Every structure is written in C-alpha cells, then in structure tokens.
Amino acid sequence: MTNFQKNHNQSDSTPSPSERVGEGFSRRNFIRTTGLTALAGLAGTESLFAAMKKKSGKTSGKGLILRFIPYELQLRHTFTLANSSRKTTPDVLISLEFEGVTGYGEASMPPYLGESIESATKFLSTLNLSQFNDPFQMDDILKYVDSVMPGNCAAKASVDIALHDLVGKLMGQPWYKIWGFDPADTPNTSFTIGIDTPEVVRQKVAEATPYKILKVKLGQKTDREMIETIRSATSVPLCVDVNQGWTDKQMALDMIHWLKEKGVVFVEQPMPKTSIDEMAWLTEHSPLPTIGDESVQRLPDVVKAKGVYNGINIKLMKCTGMREAHQMLTLAKSLDMKVMIGCMTETSCAISAAAQLSSKCEWADLDGNLLISNDPYQGVQVVKGKVTLIDQPGIGLSALDPKWKI
C-alpha cells in the first residue's frame, strides 16, 4: 500500500519567493517550490495506470494529458432496486497529467444514467484538453468539457474529479481544506441493503454491523417484509430509498407513517420524479423528511426541488462532478434545504471525491466502494460508521497494491 509523499524540506540555497518570481518562475513552479505542492502523484497509482499508455485512449500535447481505460465493478451481492437488478456496473478510470503530476477520476454508469463504457470513451476521445496549459483554469476547462456535447454526466464527472485531484496535489492540500470545511464535522455514512430474500437481507445486515444507520431499498410489494426482517436483526436507525417505486400518494403517506414507527428517519425519492404535485402534497403531510434523488440531477434542479422535497441527494455522477456538487450544496443551504451526499456503486476514487463535501451535509451515503469486491484504490475511510477524511492532497487517493495492473 502506498501513501502520498509531501515535500516539506527546502534547501538552504533555495531562492526566496520574491527572487523566484523575479527570475520568471511560472505560477506552477512557484507553488511547487514553496512547499504547497505534493510530489508528482502516487507511485502505486502510477503503476495502476501504467498500461494505459499502450492500451487506452489518450489525448496529449504540451497541456493536460488525458488517459482512460474501461473497468467493470464487481458487486458483492446482486443489487436490486425497485425496478432493476444487476451484478456489475460499467466504469471508466481516467488520469489527467500535467508536468509530471497526475490526478485520477472515474465514471461509474449504472443503467438508469443512460451511459455506457462505449458512450463514455467516445465522449472522452472527443476532448482536446491539451489546449489547456494551466490546470488552475478550472472554470474554463470544466465549462469546455460540459459544452462538448449534452448528457454524458458521468464521463464529465470523471474529468472533473481528476482535475480537482490534480489541482489539489499542485496546491498540496485536500479539497475539504481548500473549501474551508472541518473534517471533524463529517456525518455517519449509511450502508445500503438492497431488496432481497429474508435470508440474504439478514446476511447483509450482519455485514453492516459497524454502521450506525442503514439505507434500505424499497419500492416493491415486499416493502413491509423487508423492514420487518431488518428490524428482527438490528435496532439501528434506518433510512429508505424507494427509487420512485410508489405511485399512489395516500398509500405512500400511510407507508411513511408506518415507517416512522419502525425507526426510519427519512424517505428518499418515494414517488416518480414526474409526479411533482403529488410529491409536494406528500412532503407537506409527511411526518418524515423527504429527499429528492432522481428528481435532482444538476444545479437548476435544486430550486425546482424547493417545496417539493425537504432535501436533495447530490451525486457526482449525476451533476458532472465536484465543481457543480459544491455549487448545488451552497444553493441548497441558502434555500434551507437538507443535503445528502450520495454515490453510485463506485471505486474509492469517486467516493473520496464526494467525501470532500461531506462535512457540510446532514447525511452521507458513501458506501459504493464497500459494495464492490474489486476496488483498486484506497482513499476515504469509514471508522465506526463515520466518514473519515484523509489529510492528503487532492482527493486523498492511493492504490491498494502498487503491482496492481489493469
């Protein structure tokens, strides 16, 4: 397992900052030599992407260098929602390099996003990031990425995450510090229990012993059985995610009253995202907070959700990454809405990126890396159920095994 390395030592002969600037040092060199910059990336993660140069797509030039390679996430259990089941999730891992420093990102694409490895690699192949010779032009770079073609939010998020990781390394700081967030304020993360048979549900609950809140997938005829099965095994607080599975508002309200008696603390996306009036009625009468997920994809959706939901679930793969997620968080708080920072099934790369925002969120659902069996990274940790940020630059990522190859 490898760790980030920092360069804290300066030679006695190193010129002063003013002398450096006077000698025409670039801003990047100035930042690097004044000790704000981490050394050039992760040795272990570098080996993880070593095969990219030969096998992957690549755009290069004097500016940013983008590399990407397909990956498939293997789920520990079949993942069943209200309307679908799957055992794998398609993914694309990317790297973004500048002057020997590398940032990492990923695009995780569950079916409902409408993206695929083919669409993501096609999108990434169209990007000309070599035109940018200064990674600190983050707004310009990400506006360009978003403008290339519509949709492709997960693919765009992969570039956004890698750029944030890169810039954080150039600054020598994790993003939660750059944003001024207190790592002590991170919430507990929920652990997801997908729809399954009572026997498998009990097994999943047993695996989730370290977690202080469980997220239960509902939206089928077995909803009450799911909750009763879980309650027979644990008394920890629950939240439920219906994934648009309830269509009758009165039935939904009756169910929420019953769920409150069972120790549920909030309800996520109980009705279809198109049922706006019904959802607003349900929120008005609900004894529990309601959270919009599928209804809230990007920044313009936050204002639309006000009055329809009590809060929103922000996911990097929906909103094109950390930049817009931070904007959504800020806007939601200004509207007095609650915020959950969520995820898809993802590696520790995207989870660590999302975790940088968690200190300002009421809830976290950052277990996507815990639901897969082939996570190539190590990043944010969960300690006694609590999201625990790492004081490492960028998003705080390292490779689990320096010999690991794609």
Residue ranges and their predicted role:
Residues 1-14, 43-62, 406:
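Basic/polar N-terminal segments that are highly enriched at the extreme N-terminus
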Residues 9-38:
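N-terminal secretory signal peptides and thylakoid transit peptides that target proteins
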Residues 60-68, 84, 96-97, 102-170:
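Metal- or metallocofactor-binding catalytic centers and their adjacent structured scaffolds
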Residues 147, 274-281, 285-289, 296-394:
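Shared catalytic-loop signature of beta/alpha-barrel
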Residues 175-286:
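Metal-dependent enolase-superfamily TIM-barrel catalytic cores that perform enediolate-based chemistry
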